């Protein structure tokens, strides 16, 4: 219950009647303060008028006023600047060190807030707050979506910088692994990252002028050159890998790491690895070229490459030949790589270099790419939140994974709009949405 008292105070969801202290003094909340995530009072920097006098300081919140003593705040100097103690149940007075009584406000959580929060936490279908989404002002949606987009970039930046730290702070290796992970397109993302991490890029760089040797290392490290090979190309590739494996002390990942079920042939790991080998061989996708890619067209140029001759007629080593065809990345695949790898890399590098222009470049890139189409974006579209670009779809993914799936409605702007709704307004919206 205390978290709902916090919420009620933070958002000033107060009863219609006047607020008064236990001594009958009129309370006017000018600013509830900022939630404190460190030791000390729950809210800091509050501004409150008590009996006409403006006070600035901190606010502490409990279920019972006696919790003040149970938590030993009476012996903690961090609480000496508390100007108001808020509790649902006032069962005792509390005092400053000098013996003066601390003003207390009895604040009950409105019943509709309790009911609405309970409904949100019990409802399974997403988005849980769909009944109010269609009524929200455009500015409310825009502001929250912008916040979610920045949160998404921050999360990706944290992941990329952690990856870089594990790679001796090498940005080129970080780029390769980040791009490689995205070539798994969800299903094989972890496998591609594990595979890319197994490849010593310094060693591969010594053979970058040979697509055959690059493919030998790439496929060998993927565990896909084990067993009997049935044609000249794959047999020679296996022999080359065994030589390079001994030369560089390479340890491949297990072939069982890869998933093939429900994949179309053009999405098989073999094809994706062949595409990566070709991109790496052509040396177009480097950190330098990435930093100069200011549009999706420029990124498309960096990622547009065909596979070597063998892979134009094969999907695996052991499968029958197919009709010759190009195996270039599709426009949709390039968009996804730009969304999930290129833009986050630009943003992370911009943060690392304190270069706001690079961060803006990443943000602009998302805003100029078509939105992703998946179950998450379709669910939100049916509730009235339409994604106009990739920044929007990434915001909705952030919303779903970091707020909806964790039921963290109290930190969510959409959740706030639902929770504060009175019963009459909520029923009205439910009827409209039926």
Question: What kind of region is each of these model predictions?
Answer:
Residues 382-434:
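Acidic, carboxylate-rich catalytic segments that either coordinate divalent cations
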Residues 53-64, 83-87, 401-420:
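Hydrophobic/aromatic-rich, well-ordered segments within soluble, folded domains that form packed cores
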Residues 7-66, 79:
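N-terminal ordered "arm"
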């Amino acid at each position: 219950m205390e978290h709902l008292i916090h919420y009620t105070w933070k958002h000033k969801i107060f009863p219609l009647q006047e607020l008064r202290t236990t001594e009958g003094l009129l309370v006017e909340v000018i600013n509830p303060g900022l939630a404190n995530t460190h030791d000390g009072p729950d809210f800091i920097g509050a501004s409150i008028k008590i009996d006409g006098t403006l006070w600035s300081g901190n606010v502490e919140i409990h279920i019972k006023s006696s919790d003040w003593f149970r938590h030993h705040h009476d012996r903690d100097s961090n609480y000496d600047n508390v100007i108001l103690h808020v509790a649902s149940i006032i069962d005792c007075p509390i005092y400053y060190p000098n013996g003066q009584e601390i003003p207390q406000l009895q604040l009950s959580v409105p019943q509709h807030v309790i009911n609405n929060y309970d409904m949100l936490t019990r409802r399974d279908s997403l988005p849980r707050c769909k009944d109010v989404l269609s009524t929200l002002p455009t500015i409310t949606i825009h502001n929250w979506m912008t916040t979610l987009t920045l949160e998404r970039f921050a999360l990706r930046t944290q992941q990329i910088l952690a990856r870089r730290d594990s790679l001796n702070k090498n940005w080129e290796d970080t780029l390769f692994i980040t791009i490689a992970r995205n070539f798994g397109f969800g299903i094989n993302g972890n496998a591609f990252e594990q595979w890319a991490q197994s490849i010593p890029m310094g060693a591969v760089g010594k053979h970058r002028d040979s697509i055959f040797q690059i493919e030998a290392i790439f496929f060998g490290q993927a565990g896909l050159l084990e067993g009997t090979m049935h044609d000249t190309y794959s047999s020679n590739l296996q022999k080359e890998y065994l030589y390079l494996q001994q030369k560089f002390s390479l340890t491949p990942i297990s072939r069982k790491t890869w998933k093939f079920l429900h994949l179309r042939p053009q999405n098989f790991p073999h094809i994706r690895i062949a595409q990566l080998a070709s991109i790496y061989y052509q040396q177009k996708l480097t950190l330098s070229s990435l930093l100069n890619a200011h549009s999706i067209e420029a990124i498309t140029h960096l990622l547009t490459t065909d596979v070597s001759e063998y892979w134009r007629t094969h999907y695996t080593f052991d499968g029958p030949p197919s009709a010759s065809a190009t195996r270039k990345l599709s426009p949709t695949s390039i968009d996804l790589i730009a969304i999930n790898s290129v833009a986050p890399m630009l943003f992370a590098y911009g943060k690392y270099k304190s270069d706001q222009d690079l961060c803006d470049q990443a943000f602009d890139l998302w805003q100029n790419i078509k939105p992703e189409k998946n179950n998450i974006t379709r669910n939100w579209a049916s509730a009235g939140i339409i994604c106009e670009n990739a920044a929007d779809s990434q915001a909705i993914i952030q919303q779903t994974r970091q707020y909806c799936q964790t039921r963290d409605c109290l930190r969510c702007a959409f959740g706030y709009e639902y929770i504060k709704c009175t019963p009459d307004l909520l029923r009205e919206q439910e009827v409209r949405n039926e």
